[in-house]
Amino acid sequence: MRRSLRSRLATLVLLGVGALPGLPAVAADVDSSLFAQLRAAAPAANPDVLGLAARAAECARAQGLLDGFGHLAVIDYSLPSTQPRLWVFDLQRRRLLFEELVAHGRNTGAGLAERFSNVEGSRMSSIGLYQTADTYYGSNGYSLRLRGLDPGFNDNALARAIVMHGAPYVSQAIADRLGRLGRSWGCPAVREEVARTVIDTLKGGALLFAYYPDRKWLAESPFFKCAGAGATSPSAVVATAAPLPPNQG
């Protein structure tokens, strides 16, 4: 039942097209060229999620938070951890660079992500828009710091040491054996074989959009409230959907 509600909400949050008869379109103001670019490059990704990622990225740029960006990473935490749910795009060359497995936090859920937190010590993942920062070597090896841009949802990421890193518990073999990936303490961990390349691609100011159909975030994130104030916001669409289990932490 939970998955069906989650799928329903993801379907409702559309860009440019109403999800069901009588429901308004979400974002007439989205840069359709960016959305089209992402959708063409990653046909396996949920177009609704890509549309929201495009909206958030353009909003961040419109607000003057970024001078420009060449790469965008999208994580769809509504998918099980056994499926590729991280996409990394080269926006200059208009192509998909990576389609990868990515782990979520230990207390976020088992195979499915269900709970998110911005609190130190929660060992949960955080949703929202991030900007990448510098790299360093830590207890998990080569790692990429992430600066959370969504107040109340991920803006404690630096303090929590939420970083991208490689991990031995992220692999197709682990997914096949356990029916899920291993879990981090909240970090978006990737396969060790690709970690350095992915990190070097994203370091130094790229955007990372971590999605989950959380009604509060969709209603409150400043990155869904940019140009085209008359356009229907995600919160207006979410209000018509069946409730999801509450996030904790």
What is each stretch, according to the model?
Residues 1-5:
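N-terminal secretory signal peptides that target proteins for export/translocation
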Residues 10-21:
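Bacterial N-terminal signal peptides
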Residues 23-25:
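Membrane-interface motif at the C-terminal end of an N-terminal transmembrane signal
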Residues 27-185, 193-201, 206, 210-249:
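Cell wall/extracellular polymer interaction/catalysis modules
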Residues 189:
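Short aromatic/basic micro-patch
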